[in-house]
């Protein structure tokens, strides 16, 4: 086995272990933020939505800067620094009793993510061969789902005692992850050339096809982020207990572990990437619309199942399509900019979703936020269809598994 092949194989295992630690640390804390501050402390949902939206926008909106810096200086220092900064954010969150302190903790957490997320994504593109990326992204998503359940279960159990224990556990996991990267991650360069920061950013911004694709995904993310805000609140409201939230993530884990990899393997040779993304988005949009009209957990969990199935179809295709469009000369910059859609969509989804949720309650129209999200999903579906029409899209992008 050549040294390059050996490095790729070892790199896969490193990425999987690193991803599990990050997912556990994140999901111990974030799914419980809305439960803690809305249900237990009585804050308005929009106040928590601002905090979550701020974290999302800082982490993803500034991702191009984190990616460009990583292109220049390498992945390791950015990843280690970012993970320690997120740990500090979680520690601050544990003592948050005023909105401004929660916002500050989410700012720190998001800034840490800005530093470590783009270089981690670029390492996947660097180490995984193009023909294997779709399946590897599916494996990462399966890990995400399993880690989400384990993290949510652990966080829910700790929340019975003290929210500070929840935040301390998340902080410790990110400190362990920082030490893991500091010890084992080689000083790899992300790009094929040592790209100056401004050059990497210029290369991305001049790629109109990539920019259009990323901005279009903002609508997709407005729906996707509700698993952190409105869906947990809805489950808690109907069940009457935050303990039921863990079953929401258990559903996601079961569906992901059983369907993600088989669907990715089956569809990658039969359907184009953008068609898989659009099909998943359509299922997600259709499942959102009736949520505000359900009256029991069985109906709600059925719709959540449909939503997660749409995500299972869409997510591997979205990640693979983003990676396939990245220029190898500026991988970090491209993967950083690819998060801008999540920054915009996530911020609007959190803040707007929280505002609409409060408004729906005030007007006695609980279906209002869910109907709006469904409409946004349909508009995004049409926009993607227009962008990837045969007349507009180069043939190479449209091939299955491209």
Curated annotation (Swiss-Prot):
Topology of the protein relative to the lipid bilayer: Multi-pass membrane protein
Q: Which SUPFAM superfamilies match?
A: MFS general substrate transporter (SSF103473)
The protein's name is Multidrug resistance protein MdtH
Q: Where in the cell is it found?
A: Cell inner membrane
Q: Keywords assigned by UniProt?
A: Cell inner membrane, Cell membrane, Membrane, Transmembrane, Transmembrane helix, Transport
What are the recorded GO MF terms, alphabetically?
A: transmembrane transporter activity
Of which family is this protein a member? Belongs to the major facilitator superfamily. DHA1 family. MdtH (TC 2.A.1.2.21) subfamily.
Q: Which residues lie on this side of the membrane: Cytoplasmic?
A: 1-12, 117-138, 186-213, 265-276, 321-339, 389-402
Main subcellular localization, coarse class? membrane
Q: Which GO terms describe its cellular component?
A: plasma membrane
Q: What is the name of the gene encoding this protein? A: mdtH
Residues exposed to the Periplasmic side: 34-98, 160-164, 235-243, 298-299, 361-367
> What residue ranges are annotated as transmembrane?
13-33, 99-116, 139-159, 165-185, 214-234, 244-264, 277-297, 300-320, 340-360, 368-388
Species name? Salmonella schwarzengrund (strain CVM19633)
